[in-house]
Amino acid sequence: MSTEPGYASPVVNVASSLPRRAAASTVLIVPVVSTGDDDKPGAVVASAGSFLSSDAVAEIESGLRALAATGGAEQLHRLVVGSLPVSSVLTVGLGKPRSEWPADTVRRAAGVAARSLSNTETVFTTLAALPGEGVASAAVEGLILGSYRFTEFRSAKTAPKDKGLQKITVLATAKDAKQEVAHGAAVATAVATARDLVNTPPSHLFPDEFAKRARALGESVGLEVEVLDEKALQKGGYGGILGVGQGSSRPPRLVRLIHRGSRLAKKSKQAKKVALVGKGVTFDTGGISIKPAASMHHMTSDMGGAAAVIATVALAAQLQLPIDVIATVPMAENMPSGTAQRPGDVLTQYGGTTVEVQNTDAEGRLILADAIVRACEDNPDYLIETSTLTGAQTVALGARIPGVMGSDEFRDRVAAISQRVGENGWPMPLPDELKEDLKSTVADLSNISGQRFAGMLVAGVFLREFIADGVGWAHIDVAGPAYNTGSPWGYSPKGATGVPTRTMFAVLEDIAANG
């Protein structure tokens, strides 16, 4: 999907059996389960073993016995199995046996397996043969996302010596296997595109360049694209975007990407319209209210919401969802300088609301407010906004769980879908009394409250002020989940994760199917 240098997803196909003779550096990934007894070895899952001869299964289980491998969740063991036409077999543990497997269990197992591979160009897997809804798609997603690497800025001295995973063959015979596998590959590639954008350093991805990449990606899949430069923003009255960007020598942008999918619907007049909004602060120093230096370099990820939105709307066009999807993406760099906005300044948001800027490091909500008002002018049925908005999200929910706020019914719908796809968004309230803390003596609103507590919810309450009446909306705060500062886990690498791309696309699919 990406039109710029970055991660090239492996080629994915489906086969009903292993080849008679496989190429060198070929690995077969086989799921195994535990017996529940730590003294007994793991066993090959029966459905996954249906693609293997009884001799091959016996050889694998003999190897597990020799290694005292129990089949515990995400345990990996490499075996040489002479009766199979592959260089080696990689078993991945799933834990206790189940009659049906949750998709994210399979996705994580595939991701762990993929991350362990080196000098491996071709993978076969029987993971898709596991019983359970969506497991074939999940297996492919996990393999692609687990094998992700970002090497664009590495010289020959430090770049990986191998090519990385080039080809995935999914062993499956189900009627819809090819369709499910293709869907999983498309979704994972979109997530990889979002990761590439977030991992690109701010020296190379600033508002104008970000807008150019969004345009190139959008046009490559047939989206309508509109880019507003600083002059157009000034003329249009986008005070929030301009205020945040005025301290930088690299001026802000507003990008609009439009997928007109309703024309693909059987009943086009009944097709829903969805607005997507994503925070695109390409680097956030905090401005005059400057951040501590120790972790400021992580603020290369402060456009993670924008990256996910751009990848999502492009995927909607690529897979031709029969609904209208309109992405509105504000892009700015928040820098301290003689021209930067100051604490105490008052700016006028797009649409006329005035805001007192009490803290220049609460800048994301200022650019989002402009974008939300503009997005609501399109009269959407639903609006999904996502942003790396508050450190309070991580304090409240940790580094892996997004906070989901918004109108109650749609918030709960988005959170449930997020949990289903394994991104684990959690519904949070927006108490009305928090609005009192956003009162200003000189403007309509302040951009922060005077309280230490509930920072994630306060930001959501601020954004709610700009949502048009009657629009079902959700705000997904991914301050922690969008960027993994710790060790890799599951199918998540260190650095950009691409969250919440899969959540947003799954919500779009649900709206297309159910309204």
Swiss-Prot record:
It holds the Pfam family Peptidase_M17. Keywords: Aminopeptidase, Cytoplasm, Hydrolase, Manganese, Metal-binding, Protease. Mn(2+) 2 binds at K279, D284, D302, E363. Mn(2+) 1 binds at D284, D361, E363. It comes from the Bacteria. Its cofactor is Mn(2+). One of its GO terms (molecular function) is manganese ion binding. One of its GO terms (biological process) is proteolysis. It is found in: Cytoplasm. Belongs to the peptidase M17 family. Presumably involved in the processing and regular turnover of intracellular proteins. Catalyzes the removal of unsubstituted N-terminal amino acids from various peptides. This is Probable cytosol aminopeptidase. It comes from Mycolicibacterium paratuberculosis (strain ATCC BAA-968 / K-10) (Mycobacterium paratuberculosis). The gene is pepA.
